[in-house]
Regions:
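Structural motif corresponding to the intra-repeat A-B loop/turn of tetratricopeptide repeats
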Residues: 13-14, 58
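TPR/TPR-like (Sel1-like) alpha-helical repeat modules
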Residues: 24-29, 52-77
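Residue register within tetratricopeptide repeats
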Residues: 15-18, 62
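Flexible helix-coil transition and linker loops at the boundaries of alpha-helical arrays
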Residues: 29-41, 81
Length: 82
């Protein structure tokens, strides 16, 4: 996924501001509403965790709470399907 790779590259280059938040939000938008594959679910969880950390660093506690709740609500699809 190009948007996810762009966000990871921005992060690796030291970006921590609103541009990176927008890029991660773009990843969520591009994934749509599902249903999601295991890989997509993993990406969503990682993106929400990253958004949580970024919004905490940018002092936006309301958004941070939302992103943390979204990350915590996702479970791995492999954990209970046998």
């Amino acid at each position: 996924m190009i948007a996810f790779n762009n966000a990871k590259e921005m992060e690796a280059n030291g970006e921590q501001g609103s541009a990176l938040i927008v890029e991660y939000e773009r990843v969520i938008y591009k994934l749509g509403e599902g249903p999601f594959t295991e890989a997509q679910n993993h990406i969503r969880k990682e993106v929400y965790r990253n958004l949580y950390e970024l919004t905490i660093m940018n002092d936006d506690e309301e958004k941070a709470k939302h992103y943390k709740e979204m990350a915590d609500s996702l479970t791995d699809l492999t954990s209970s399907e046998d």
